[in-house]
Amino acid sequence: MGLASTGLLGDETMTKFDRDDGVSRRKVLECMTWAGTGVLWTISGGVPHSLGIMGEAQAQTSKSLTFLQLSDSHVGFDKPANPNALGTLEEAIVKVNALPIKPAFAIHTGDISHLSLESQFDDADRIISQSRLDVHYVPGEHDFLDPDQKFYKDRYGRGTKGAGWYSFDASGVHFIGMVNVFNLKAGGLGDLGADQLEWLEDDVKHLSASTPIVVFAHIPLWTIYPDWGWGTDDAEQALSYLKRFGSVTVLNGHIHQVMQKVEGNVTFHTARSTAFPQPAPGQGPSPGPMKVPDDQLRTMLGIANVTFKQNEQRLAIIDTPLKA
């Protein structure tokens, strides 16, 4: 699992690749960065911003809403890319507890477990609870491997709709947790489905256009690399219901690296994993755990902190690596 941030920190480097298919090389280079341990999100006036986790974060006022994004913890993973995913999750929570500003709550954008085992969910809960934060979850495909998705739904899905979608409000911001791993399409593309789209349209239709919106789901709601299933086939319809809002932020995981894109009033951001990195889009035959030198692993894992401030359009997002 990882924490996500929208900003570029001093310890981040650009990841380059030369493939022209899927997304244009220039566009990916413009929006893609490797980050470290986490993302600190600040929403101020509806706008996400990128902050240095120990510097600018300390300057945030009490009028800001700050929350944490975790993603892709893959508890139970023990392959060469990271033989101790539980240990790096623990390191991430230590980072969270050392933040200069305590987040109001956390969101987890899926793949809590690696194999949907009850014991893996138990271990994840034990570690994440050490943050002493309320956590709002959405599932990844690795959380839905057991018959009827019972272990995830019994633990995290109470009070949700359908396969686990829901919404809530905090400090004037409307948060929407969506599920796009229930019925994966060809190549592993995410899918929201007609029932969830109908629910979304109804969920937001009575909101003022000035309401800041934060959507979070596991698979990106923008097409990053369709050959690897890094996108959601019906995301465009979902986003059409959000066009009238002045500030929309979409937070995802799944690809285990930080990428960001801004389209009009919508900011898209993907978070790091706390378990293992994956290749840059098109760099290799397929996605999956990527083995890197041991001294580099923790620079590719991390957390994200997000802050919202009144009268600002975009959220401030801070990515912090487990190791600088």
Question: Which residues fall in each region the model found?
Answer:
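Active-site neighborhood of phospho(di)ester-bond hydrolases with catalytic His/Asp-centered motifs
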Residues: L70-S71, A106-G110, H136-E141, F216-A217, ...
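N-terminal active-site segment of His-dependent metallophosphoesterases
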Residues: W41, S50-D122, D202
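Short acidic, glycine-rich surface-loop motifs adjacent to enzyme active sites
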Residues: S208-I224
